[in-house]
Amino acid sequence: GKNACILHYGENNNIVQAGDLILMDFGVEYANYAADLSRTIPVSGKFSPRQKEVYNACLRIQKAGIELFNTSLSLIEYNAEIGKITESELIQLGLLDKIAVKNQNPNAPLYKKYFMHGAGHFLGIDVHDVGPRYEKIQYGNLFTIEPGIYIPAENIGIRIEDNIHVTPEGNVNLMHDIPVTVEEIEDIMLGS
């Protein structure tokens, strides 16, 4: 529902209704190290056509982000690239205008209306661990890739977050066994 558009919602006092989405952001600690995961699920077991459209756009951003995240970029550069990918998806969703994006103030990108947080953060001893934002990403870094699309006017808030380990052989998604596609989530929700 509408509270999925609040990045870190704390009250949790509303009764969910059919048609609502539940955005879950949770993690665990093991041996003093943190993990962080977000998934969005439909209360009724099936996404509406619009929810599915927005969810799949967010998933495409995440998949592109996992591929893009590498040692040639700093976190600042990575976020800028994710911003461009997000703009394209928001244009396709009818939320942004291509001409307005072309003429936007680069210091106030229009996509931030619908994706107001960073594309991810360092993980380690703390769930939001410290790391150099302006230096190149290093092998061994552990990072979240967590795009979100939040549309308060439509009561749609979607975030998909996985933990990525950067290795010389490529990025390893530590959450690869956790369902993430619309089909996987609907199968679980409907008991298939």
Protein language model features and the residues they cover:
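Active-site neighborhoods and metal-handling regions in enzymes and metal-associated proteins
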Residues: G1-S192
